[in-house]
Amino acid sequence: MFLTVDELYTHLHDETVAVISRDTEAIPVAAIDAAIAEAKSYLHDFDTAAIFSAEGEARNALLLLFVKDIAVWHFVNLGNACIDMELREKRYDSAIAWLRLVQKGDLSPDLPPRTAELGHESPIGKIHFGSNSKRGQHY
């Protein structure tokens, strides 16, 4: 798994997580899943399956930091127990701004590029070139 609930403790105190989640792991796991889905939507030019299946040191540290920020934002929206919402909102906005820059191509993170699937001629880059099928005219 790309991000675990225990890794959220670098961004939130454990008692805060316990209060909001009411001691169940379903709520933080749902926030993590939502954060990963949101990050994937911005990283369509990259191999998201490889990126988000990485574990440990194989993960991109900057992307991990921003996915944590997004997950914490989704998580703390459930309740504001001891949370500085302005700080969380700024960190969330910063993460989304970074993902948008990557999406536009202004930033080039150290992530694996997307490759073409076997048997499919789907475009890999931003532009797809092609032509119409050849026609034969008979009179």
Language-model region placement:
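Conserved short "hinge" loops at termini or chain/domain junctions
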Residues: 1-61, 122-139
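Oligomerization/assembly interface segments of phage tail-like spikes and tubes
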Residues: 8, 69-73
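Short alpha-helix boundary/capping elements
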Residues: 36-43, 67, 75, 79
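Core structural elements
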Residues: 60-70
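Short loop/turn elements at secondary-structure junctions
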Residues: 73-139
